[in-house]
């Protein structure tokens, strides 16, 4: 048995020769299919193993392939992505082009409309310029005068135009058509309808002028220029108009003459320039009037009309008895400026025995309040005129006129005690008349109120040879350095010549280099040095000369 097993093991270890041809056939086939294959018994290198890895994978799973890393192509996208992008860019460009064309078309339409409107406006302006040139030519041919209206004039008091030009210009303010044959002259100006009542009246023009106290000079100048003076009535024969148009206030006429009489002998242009100069200069005192209040102007505007009616000797004609009674009532009121006696009695103007005292209230407003002492029967036929107290009046002067002088400066209130004082020093210590002042101290100042003055007097009387304290000069027999003037001697202040606005303008136009003056600049310089007073704006003559010398 042992011998058989040995023979079997030996035979198993020996390769069989017949199996070799089959193995060679398989190798040749595998060589054609997968390439050369090394002997299984031989050892393989790492490079050979790497080369053989795909083949091993194919043997394991020949159909499954690993996925690539990165973005995967979608089946929905077109085959050519660049073509799709180009088409989108072309669509956006066409859209922008259409929008731009639409904007340009809109802008062209807007510019056309603007051009047409501008052309129309230019045509209208050219036509307006031609009309103004035609009006200017007509105005140059006519003898129209430009006059400034009165300052602070109430237009409701008079409906008549102040100049012939103003009444004629109302028809030309809308322009003159080239087709209309318009020829203007001073004689062709139509009078207002109010004058027709006077033309139909039986009274003559001279009687009317004498009736309303119009000076002949004003009548001649007004008839030549077609103007109305402040005192000219409104030509209506109604009683109320006759009463209202009566010249109650002389101050308005005075103001008008002050403006028109700036200087004698000048032409109309110089007078007009003088009015403007005075108006600008008067703004330094806060007023635009041509000339300020004068000394002849009533001091209290509230009693202005009443005082003028009281002073007037010729009463206005009354077409009705009731208006005449109202005038008598107005005249019966006293002039408050002249007398304010509380105990004064007034007899009724209607012949009665009733009398009433002046109101005890010191205020001027109490004069215009109704008095219960007057019988109502006296006033049953009186026509009250509300315009009498509602119209504008010029501002009143200061009630403390005695405290101020005409130049607007304060008077020397302490003249009784300090007339010997020196301007540059203290009253007692530095005055040249200090000793005289101390000697008469008891007369001027009571000892109980000013004991120190008494003490100084005793000191000086007891020590005549010593120098007084506080630098007072020594008074003695040997003191001949300064002669003391008498007590009543007063050193007058330096007087300054002040010029009113008309006088200043007269100096300006009489200057040899007047044509080269800058009036606005000169007026602004003079305004800084102007002084306000009750008589108007005043300027120091030296300031005026200094301002005029700058142009030399």
UniProtKB/Swiss-Prot annotation:
SUPFAM superfamilies: Leucine zipper domain, YAP1 redox domain. PROSITE patterns: BZIP, BZIP_BASIC. Residues 36-47, 62-80 have a biased composition (Basic and acidic residues). Changing residue 285 to S: Constitutively cytoplasmic. Residues 229-240 have a biased composition (Low complexity). It is found in: Nucleus; Cytoplasm. Belongs to the bZIP family. YAP subfamily. Transcription activator involved in multidrug resistance, oxidative stress response, and redox homeostasis. Regulates the transcription of genes encoding antioxidant enzymes like catalase ctt1 and components of the cellular thiol-reducing pathways, including the thioredoxin system (trx2, trr1), ABC transporters involved in multidrug resistance like bfr1/hba2 and pmd1 as well as the gene obr1/apt1. Preferentially binds to promoters with the core binding site 5'-TTA[CG]TAA-3'. This is AP-1-like transcription factor.
